[in-house]
């Protein structure tokens, strides 16, 4: 087996990235309209996308596929208006996820869960503007949804909550990975 990415690897990567993103958006879009849910949005994304990601891992046998998925996910998030901070974080946490998966020979269940949890931290990129560019974020939210919505978002996103957002994404990614693994096992035994 060649270590280089082939056309079939890139096709799988593209299909699973789209599946991962669409499933995540199905959760994120309705929840994102309710400001009080924004702090847990990344965690819920990581929970529900654990299913397609674990399915994706059945196809990943080559280094770099998770990194590329992270970059593409960040790019797609940027194109939907959530800022492009997900791209560099997708590259960093995708690479770390790839390294973890490779250290387990792409077969270790524990490394798959840890790799997914680390990979999922790319989602923190969508929160960076809310924490570090507060005035610009408020103006963007106000222009799109009104000043009242913008005020409510900023009220539920104090700077200290970034620690909870990061921890929530990581922990819920573990649960999402377990959910994905359980679904895969149930499909195998049908």
Per-segment meaning from a language model:
Residues 188-190:
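Conserved small/polar residues in nucleotide/adenosyl-binding loops
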Residues 22, 90-128, 177:
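Short helix-perturbing small/polar motifs within transmembrane alpha-helices
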Residues 38, 113-185:
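Membrane-embedded alpha-helical hairpins and interfacial helices in multi-pass inner-membrane proteins
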Residues 16-20, 45, 49, 53, ...:
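Alpha-helical transmembrane segments in multi-pass membrane proteins
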Residues 7-16, 41, 45, 64-69, ...:
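Alpha-helical transmembrane segments of integral membrane proteins
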Residues 17-25, 72-80, 118-128:
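Aromatic-anchored segments of alpha-helical transmembrane domains
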Residues 28-34, 73-101:
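Interfacial aromatic-anchored transmembrane helix boundaries in multi-pass membrane proteins
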Residues 2-68:
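Hydrophobic transmembrane alpha-helices
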């Amino acid at each position: 087996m060649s270590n280089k990415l082939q056309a079939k690897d890139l096709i799988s990567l593209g299909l699973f990235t789209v599946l991962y993103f669409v499933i995540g958006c199905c959760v994120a879009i309705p929840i994102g309209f309710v400001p009080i849910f924004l702090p847990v949005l990344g965690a819920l994304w990581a929970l529900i996308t654990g299913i397609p990601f674990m399915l994706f891992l059945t196809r990943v046998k080559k280094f770099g596929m998770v990194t590329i998925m992270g970059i593409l996910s960040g790019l797609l998030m940027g194109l939907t208006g959530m800022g492009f901070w997900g791209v560099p974080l997708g590259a960093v946490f995708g690479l770390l996820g790839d390294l973890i998966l490779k250290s387990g020979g792409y077969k270790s269940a524990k490394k798959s869960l840890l790799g997914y949890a680390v990979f999922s931290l790319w989602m923190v990129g969508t929160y960076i503007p809310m924490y570090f560019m507060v005035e610009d974020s408020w103006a963007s939210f106000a222009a799109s949804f009104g000043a009242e919505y913008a005020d409510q978002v900023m009220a539920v996103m104090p700077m200290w909550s970034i620690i909870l957002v990061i921890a929530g994404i990581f922990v819920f990614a573990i649960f999402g990975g377990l959910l994905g693994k359980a679904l895969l096992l149930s499909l195998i035994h049908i």
